[in-house]
Amino acid sequence: MPFEHVTVLLHEAIALLDIKPEGTYVDATLGGGGHTGEILKQLTTGTLYSFDQDDTAIQYNAEQYADEIAAGKLVIIHKNFRTLTSALADYGVTAVDGIVYDLGVSSVQFDDGQRGFSYKYDAELDMRMDQRQALTAKTIVNEWPFNELMRVLSRYGEDRFPKQIARKIEQHRENAPINTTFELVDIIKEAIPAPARRKGGHPAKRSFQAFRIAVNDELGALEDSLTQALELLATDGKISVITFQSLEDRLVKQMFREKSSAPELPAGLPVLPGQFEADYELLTRKPISPSTEEMAINHRAESAKLRGIRRK
């Protein structure tokens, strides 16, 4: 299907990177190619390495940017961004000037009813960002034990009723496998008390987020990738990260804060000024949010937050 993904905070995210025309850059989440296209406009002799694990994104951008690929200006890497260091090493790259992340599910993945990401479309329970992997939402819902289901719903969905939903799933799958998104939606609705169903948006929203994060190990992959990204940065290199939900934002905020904080030293220890300064500095003391105008155009922008960090 054609890509119709509207990139959120596009110019703000790229502005934080302060692109050098001759630099080496990474788009960790190629998606619809919005950030990739913007970076390419600003490169002259530089090179951009763009990662994605989604077949559709890879095929679409390979066609869109065929000339840039042929010229060696763009390299598309069909891998999860948690392989950042090893994948770039395959191209002889050991340091980069900037990395951009645009996290979460792309509009194309979400709106493709057959991918099973959305509670709005009836489809097989899939939710894989990388169609090559074996684990699907169907496997988790039908095979993972009660305690694991409860942990996933509580931790990744911050669900108010994880025990009730996990128990209801367990009861239903004893009779027959749970195969589709709508079957799961009905089970979740059945598990949640009626007063709670009537407020706070769609009752299955948090549960679907939880299973999607579990299927793709999104938080684990992000932590792995950011750890590598921070080490890959050259002097004056920068990272900008756009998040769309609190779990991701909390992780990014915590990692950036730790890296940009000087180590705590015993009182009275004789040290020279600057001797124990942090190697990184925050580019955003508070996250950047979309403008009112952008949110009016794209309702999915409402929860977006942009954070940045620089290596000194």
Curated annotation (Swiss-Prot):
Task: Quote a single Gene Ontology cellular component term.
Answer: cytoplasm
A Pfam family the protein falls into: Methyltransf_5
Quote the InterPro entries the UniProt record gives.
Answer: RsmH, SAM-dep_MeTrfase_MraW_recog, SAM-dependent_MTases_sf
Q: Which NCBIfam families match?
A: 16S rRNA (cytosine(1402)-N(4))-methyltransferase RsmH
Q: Which organism is it from?
A: Leuconostoc mesenteroides subsp. mesenteroides (strain ATCC 8293 / DSM 20343 / BCRC 11652 / CCM 1803 / JCM 6124 / NCDO 523 / NBRC 100496 / NCIMB 8023 / NCTC 12954 / NRRL B-1118 / 37Y)
| Similarity annotation | Belongs to the methyltransferase superfamily. RsmH family.
**Where is it localised?**
Cytoplasm
Quote the PANTHER family the UniProt record gives. Answer: 12S RRNA N4-METHYLCYTIDINE METHYLTRANSFERASE (PTHR11265:SF0), S-ADENOSYL-METHYLTRANSFERASE MRAW (PTHR11265)
Source organism's superkingdom? Bacteria
Q: Supply the gene name.
A: rsmH
Q: Where does S-adenosyl-L-methionine bind?
A: G33, G34, H35, D52, F81, D102, Q109
Q: Which reaction does it catalyse?
A: cytidine(1402) in 16S rRNA + S-adenosyl-L-methionine = N(4)-methylcytidine(1402) in 16S rRNA + S-adenosyl-L-homocysteine + H(+)
EC numbers? 2.1.1.199
What is the organism lineage in this UniProt record? Bacteria, Bacillati, Bacillota, Bacilli, Lactobacillales
GO terms, biological process? rRNA base methylation
GO molecular function list: rRNA (cytosine-N4-)-methyltransferase activity
Reported function: Specifically methylates the N4 position of cytidine in position 1402 (C1402) of 16S rRNA.
Could you tell me the keywords of this UniProt record? Answer: Cytoplasm, Methyltransferase, rRNA processing, S-adenosyl-L-methionine, Transferase
UniProt protein name: Ribosomal RNA small subunit methyltransferase H
